[in-house]
Amino acid sequence: MVKRYGELYLEARRALRASEGENASFVARELLGFASGKSAAALMADRELYASEQTAERMEQYTARALQGEPLAYILGKWSFYGLELTVTPDVLIPRDDTMAVTELAIGKLREMEAPQRVLDLCTGSGCIGLAIAHQIETARVTLADLSQPALRIARKNIADLKMIGRVNALQADVREPAPKFWGQFDLIVSNPPYVTAQEMTELDVSVRAHEPEMALDGGEDGLDFYRAILQNFTPALRTGGWICFEFGFR
């Protein structure tokens, strides 16, 4: 049955209300935009027009995925962070607004340093922190590092998509191992490491537990395993007067 854009939106919003609450309108609008290839403004203008069968089928599929708990960012394959549109997949954590705090802290510290500022983003995932830094501070030279090769593929795609090749690079590194090749190279290290405790891992919302990468969440028994490892193994990577900036959880 052929339906209008407005009908597709309202049906999805109703279906999503129980799981998404007040966010149902936003999710339904984003899904319809993705299914149709139209902007929010175009959908509003075209709400009385009939959508194609292909658009209606895609909308049904995307809504079903959302109802099963799949995060919106993974359905869309992209997410916005610090004004940048980033590719995201289940290989990386979804960038969250909370992470803007450590990003802003790092940017503030780097503005006080002489150019070119050398930055290492550990446990980088999608690269969101390091890429935001590079976007805000053009003189910064940023290295994105992660143990996960699938995550590094996403980070490298984001580097290329944002046209930051030459200022940002990505490489594999295990923060649990000493890294003498990095010693004395960086003015600032920034990291949003895994910090969920063993107990909290069992209590995570299904949308996180079933879809986001466990290795990017699990911080060990007390949630501090990666902080200890980074401080032990990567403090020597700092130049004199350098900084380490961490995101951490509250409990």
Can you say where each PLM-predicted feature lies in the sequence?
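Residue-level signal for inorganic ion chemistry
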Residues: 31, 69, 99, 129, ...
